[in-house]
UniProtKB/Swiss-Prot annotation:
It is found in: Cell membrane. Residues 207-273 form the KH domain. This is Ribonuclease Y. The chain crosses the membrane at residues 1-21. Its EC number is 3.1.-.-.
Length: 517
C-alpha cells in the first residue's frame, strides 16, 4: 500500500515537473515568435514607407513632367498664336494696300472721266466756233475772189480737212501711247498679283536615289554570289545600282524618275524581307509596279480635287499622276503644271476670265510629257491628241498648242496659261539646260535600241556611257545578238553627238520552265 502511494506521488511529481518544463518551453517559444512577429511587422512597415516614398517621388516626377509638358505646350501655342497674329497683321496690311490701290484707281478713273467731259465740252465749243468762222470765211471769199458759195465751201473744207487730219493723228498717237502705258501698268499689276498670291515650292530633280540600309553586310547579299543578284536588279529595274564605300547606303542612278522610284521601293522591300534572289527580285518588281500604277491614279485624283476640277477622263487623270515622274530641264513636270494651273487661275480671275477653265488648261498644258517616254512625237502633239480623243474643252487644246507658239491664243484663259507657263519656266533656277540636253541624249540612245526588232527593253546606265539592251531569246539567237549590238552602235555613232564612247551591251537570256506534277 505504501509502495502504491509512493508510486502515485512520484507520478504526480513527474507530471508537475513535466508541466513546468513544457510551460517554460512554451514561454520561450512565445517570446521567439513574438520577436519574429515584431521583426516582420517592422520590415513590413519599412517596406510600406519605402513604397510610399517611391510613390511620392513618382508623383512628384509625374507632376514635374506634366508641368513641363504643359509649359512647353503653352509656349508652343503662344508662339503659334503670335505667328497667327503676325499673319493676320500682314494680311490686314495687304488688304489696306489693296484698298489704297483701288481708291487711287477710282480717283484716276474719276479724273479721266472729268477730263473726257471737259474735252467733250471744249470740242462742242470748237465746233460752234468752227461753224461761225466758216460762215465768216465764206462771206469774205465770196466778196474778195468772186467765188460761188459751193466753191468757197469746198476750198475751205479741204484746208480744214488737211489740218484736222494732222491734229487727229497727233491725238490718236497720244492716246495710243497712254493706252499702252496703262495696259503695261495693268499687266504688271496682274502679274505681281499672281506671283504674290501663289508661292510655290521648287526642288530640282536629281539623277540618283539613296537607299539606306541597317548594316553594310546587306551589300554583299544584294551583290549575290558571283554578282547574280546585282545583275538581275540592273536588268529588271533598268537602273544603275552603285555599291561603294558609302556607309549604310546603296545608290541608284537613272535619268528616268519612274524607274528610279520603282527601283528604290523594290530594294527597300527586298532588304526588309531578307530574301534576296533573282526570282524574288522579279516577284517584288511586279508587285511594286502594280502598286505604282494604283498610286499614280490616286495622285492624279487628289491633284484635281485640290484644284477643284471635275469630269476628267480616268486615262487623263492617270497621265496627270505620271507627270510626277517626268522632268523638263530639271524641273519636275507635275510641280510645273501645278504652278501653271494656280497662276493661270489667278491671272484669268484678274482679267475677267473663267478661273476654273484656266486652271484646267494649266494642269493639262504639258500632259503630253507623260507620254514622250512611250510614244514618238512632241509633247504638244501627243497632249493635244489625247485631249481631243477624250473630248476635252477647246480652250484646253488651244492652250496646249499656244504655249509653244503653234497657234494663237484664242481666249483670255489660254493667254493666262501662256503667261503662267512663261512665268514658271523663266523663274531663276527653275530649269537647267545642260541637264535637259543630257537627258534628251540618253532618251535618244534608248529609243534607237528599242526600235530594233526582237528587243524587249533598253536601259542607259553609267551616266549614258553604257546601254543595256534586253533581247527576246525566242526572236533573237546568239549570232543575231552580236549583229544587233553592232547595228545599234553604228546607228548611235551616226545619229548622236556625244563625248567619249558608249558601250552597247546586248543581253540574251533563255529560261526553260517546267512543272513536275
Amino acid at each position: 500500500m505504501i509502495e502504491v502511494v509512493v508510486g502515485i506521488g512520484a507520478g504526480l511529481i513527474g507530471i508537475g515537473a513535466g508541466y513546468l518544463v513544457a510551460k517554460k518551453i512554451n514561454d520561450a517559444n512565445y517570446s521567439i515568435f513574438l520577436e519574429q512577429a515584431k521583426a516582420k511587422a517592422k520590415a513590413i512597415e519599412f517596406e510600406a514607407e519605402s513604397i510610399l516614398k517611391d510613390a511620392k517621388v513618382k508623383v512628384n516626377e509625374a507632376e514635374f513632367e506634366a508641368k513641363k509638358r504643359y509649359e512647353e505646350k503653352g509656349s508652343r501655342l503662344q508662339k503659334e498664336y503670335n505667328q497667327k497674329l503676325d499673319d493676320i497683321s500682314k494680311k490686314e496690311h495687304a488688304i489696306l494696300n489693296e484698298q489704297e490701290i483701288l481708291k487711287n484707281s477710282k480717283d484716276e478713273l474719276e479724273k479721266s472721266q472729268n477730263q473726257a467731259k471737259t474735252l467733250y465740252e471744249e470740242g462742242l465749243n470748237l465746233k460752234i466756233a468752227y461753224q461761225d468762222k466758216l460762215s465768216e470765211t465764206l462771206k469774205v471769199l465770196e466778196h474778195v475772189a468772186g467765188l460761188t458759195e459751193d466753191e468757197a465751201k469746198n476750198m475751205v473744207l479741204r484746208k480744214v480737212e488737211e489740218k484736222s487730219r494732222a491734229e487727229i493723228a497727233h491725238i490718236v498717237r497720244k492716246y495710243e501711247e497712254e493706252a499702252k502705258k496703262e495696259a503695261k501698268k495693268r499687266a504688271n499689276y496682274i502679274l505681281a498679283q499672281a506671283t504674290s498670291r501663289y508661292a510655290g515650292e521648287f526642288a530640282a530633280e536629281r539623277l540618283i536615289n539613296v537607299v539606306n540600309i541597317k548594316n553594310d553586310e546587306l551589300k554583299g547579299r544584294i551583290i549575290g554570289k558571283e554578282g547574280r543578284n546585282i545583275k538581275t536588279l540592273e536588268m529588271v529595274l533598268g537602273v544603275d545600282v552603285i555599291i561603294d564605300d558609302t556607309p549604310h547606303a546603296i545608290i541608284l542612278s537613272s535619268f528616268n524618275l519612274y524607274r528610279r522610284a520603282i527601283a528604290t521601293r523594290v530594294i527597300e522591300l527586298l532588304v526588309e524581307d531578307g530574301r534576296i534572289q533573282p526570282a524574288r527580285i522579279e516577284e517584288i518588281h511586279k508587285k511594286v509596279c502594280d502598286e505604282f500604277e494604283a498610286s499614280i491614279l490616286e495622285e492624279g485624283e487628289n491633284i484635281l480635287i485640290d484644284l477643284g476640277i471635275s469630269k476628267v477622263h480616268p486615262e487623263i487623270v492617270k497621265l496627270i499622276g505620271k507627270l510626277k515622274f517626268r522632268a523638263s530641264y530639271g524641273q519636275n513636270a507635275l510641280a510645273h503644271s501645278l504652278e501653271v494651273a494656280h497662276l493661270s487661275g489667278i491671272i484669268a480671275a484678274e482679267t475677267g476670265g473663267d478661273e476654273k477653265l484656266a486652271k484646267r488648261a494649266g494642269i493639262l498644258h504639258d500632259i503630253g510629257k507623260a507620254l514622250t517616254h512611250e510614244y514618238e512625237g512632241s509633247h504638244v502633239d501627243l497632249g493635244a491628241e489625247i485631249c481631243k480623243r477624250y473630248k476635252e474643252h477647246p480652250v484646253v487644246i488651244n492652250a496646249i498648242y499656244a504655249h509653244h507658239g503653234h497657234e494663237e491664243a484664242l481666249s483670255v484663259e489660254c493667254a493666262a496659261v501662256c503667261a503662267a507657263d512663261a512665268l514658271s519656266a523663266a523663274r531663276p533656277g527653275a530649269r537647267r539646260e545642260v541637264l535637259e540636253s543630257f537627258l534628251k541624249r540618253v532618251e535618244e540612245i534608248e529609243s534607237i535600241a528599242i526600235s530594233k526588232e526582237g528587243i524587249k527593253g533598253a536601259y542607259a546606265i553609267n551616266a549614258g556611257r553604257e546601254i543595256r539592251v534586253i533581247a527576246n531569246a525566242k526572236l533573237v539567237n546568239d549570232d543575231e545578238a552580236v549583229l544587233l549590238a553592232k547595228e545599234i552602235a553604228e546607228e548611235i555613232q551616226d545619229k548622236i553627238q556625244y563625248p567619249g564612247e558608249i558601250k552597247v551591251n546586248v543581253i540574251r537570256e533563255l529560261r526553260a520552265i517546267e512543272f513536275a506534277k
